[in-house]
Amino acid sequence: IHPVRYPATATANATVTDRSTPGWSAVGTNRLGETTIHVMFWLERMVPRPDDAIRTSYEHPLSAGLVGDRLVAYESVTGQQGYVWRTVWESPAEAREFHDGYLRLLRFRVGGDRLAPAAEGPGKRYVIRSGPFADAFRVRLDGDTVTIVNAPSVDGLETLHAPSG
C-alpha cells in the first residue's frame, strides 16, 4: 500500500492481554491489517467511492498509519461470541484519526447509541440495539493505540475484557 515506507517503517507487535473471566475462552487470533480497515470504512461509505468501485491503492487517512494490529476472538461457555482488537499507529494523531472514524462508524453508519461512561474504566461504550451489528462496543484511545472490545451485551464487555484502568 505504501511502498516508499518499506522497509524503513517498522511494524509493531500488537498484543492483547487476556483479561477475560472464566466464562470466556480465546478461540482464535489474527491480524486484520490496513487493507481490511480501509474496506471496513469503504463498505460503510466512509471512504469516497465516486464510481462505487474500491480504489486499488487502499490508501485513506482513516487506515493509513497502521503499524500493527491483533484481533483475538472469544467464545463464552454459552456460545456467545466477541473479540478484542488492538491497533497500533505511527503516532497518537494517526490513532486519534482511526478512533474518531470508528466512533463515527458506530454512531452514524450502524446505529450505535453512546452510553454513559463506565465506572469500571476508560473507553467510550456503545450499544447497537438491533440489526446485523447488534452488540456492545468499548473503544479506548491510549496514545498511539486503539483497543476495541466487542461483546453481545454491555455487561459482556467487562467479563470478556476487563478494563485496565
Map each language-model feature to its residues.
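Beta/coil-rich, acidic/histidine-enriched accessory regions frequently appended to metallopeptidases
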Residues: 1-165
